Swiss-Prot record:
It comes from the Bacteria. Homotetramer. Forms an RuvA(8)-RuvB(12)-Holliday junction (HJ) complex. HJ DNA is sandwiched between 2 RuvA tetramers; dsDNA enters through RuvA and exits via RuvB. An RuvB hexamer assembles on each DNA strand where it exits the tetramer. Each RuvB hexamer is contacted by two RuvA subunits (via domain III) on 2 adjacent RuvB subunits; this complex drives branch migration. In the full resolvosome a probable DNA-RuvA(4)-RuvB(12)-RuvC(2) complex forms which resolves the HJ. HAMAP family: DNA_HJ_migration_RuvA. This is Holliday junction branch migration complex subunit RuvA. Gene3D superfamilies: 5' to 3' exonuclease, C-terminal subdomain, DNA helicase RuvA subunit, C-terminal domain, Nucleic acid-binding proteins. Residues 144-157 are annotated as: Flexible linker. Has three domains with a flexible linker between the domains II and III and assumes an 'L' shape. Domain III is highly mobile and contacts RuvB. Pfam families: HHH_5, RuvA_C, RuvA_N. The RuvA-RuvB-RuvC complex processes Holliday junction (HJ) DNA during genetic recombination and DNA repair, while the RuvA-RuvB complex plays an important role in the rescue of blocked DNA replication forks via replication fork reversal (RFR). RuvA specifically binds to HJ cruciform DNA, conferring on it an open structure. The RuvB hexamer acts as an ATP-dependent pump, pulling dsDNA into and through the RuvAB complex. HJ branch migration allows RuvC to scan DNA until it finds its consensus sequence, where it cleaves and resolves the cruciform DNA. Its main location: cytoplasm. Residues 1-64 are annotated as: Domain I.
């Protein structure tokens, strides 16, 4: 089991990070809430990880905090929730926001997540109600501990148009192209990078609390 990786961040994009550790490059699937906290490429990063093995694939999932990683492990035990949907859930809501939804039995916020219908939302509320007790002591109002460099990225780098990149990221998460374009248009401002656009769009689409 690979429980944690610390190394140099070589590449990052919404949904994935490439981390070099001891000469090996690890492709790690990450939720957007973790992507937002990654440092600039070339800096050191620590990710709490979950290694999944299937007949047709081996996947490594990375998270900004132990709480996010441990919640992911509980989510994939819910009937009908696989790793992809669990990552999608943690892309729209961070662990603490999700826990608050469960405690408040807030199905309305959950059904706004792509891939989560009414039945899945109700199943999540029922099955996770008892399981979140396993996270006791981890649910604290603190910042994720992922960056060990100078901090999260704040400026866009040369590359694709930020709006197009942000729309593509929302579509990859499961939103329809029209929904993604509308959400980005609502929050777009001058000199915004794709990370900021995605974060603000998700905040509007999935209000927490």
């Amino acid at each position: 089991m690979i429980g944690r990786i610390r190394g140099m961040l070589i590449e990052k994009s919404p949904g994935q990070a490439l981390v070099e550790c001891s000469g090996l490059g690890y492709e790690i699937d990450i939720p957007y809430t973790t992507f937002f906290h990654l440092p600039e490429t070339g800096q050191e990063v620590t990710l709490h990880t979950h290694f999944a093995v299937r007949e047709d694939a081996q996947s490594l999932y990375g998270f900004a905090s132990r709480l996010d990683r441990n919640l992911f492990r509980l989510l994939i035990k819910v009937n009908g929730v696989g790793p992809k949907l669990a990552v999608g859930i943690l892309s729209g809501l961070d662990a603490q926001q999700f826990i608050r939804c469960v405690e408040a039995r807030d199905a309305n916020s959950l059904v706004k997540l792509p891939g989560v219908g009414k039945k899945t939302a109700e199943r999540l509320l029922i099955e996770m109600a008892d399981r979140i007790g396993q996270l006791e002591g981890q649910f604290v109002p603190s910042q994720p501990d992922v960056p060990t460099g100078a901090g999260a990225a704040t400026a866009s780098q040369a590359g694709p148009d930020p709006r197009e990149e942000a729309e593509a990221a929302l579509i990859a998460l499961g939103y329809k192209p029209q929904e993604a374009a509308k959400a980005i248009s609502k929050v777009a401002g001058p000199d915004m990078n794709s990370e900021t656009l995605i974060r603000l769009a998700l905040k509007n689409m999935i209000p927490a609390g």
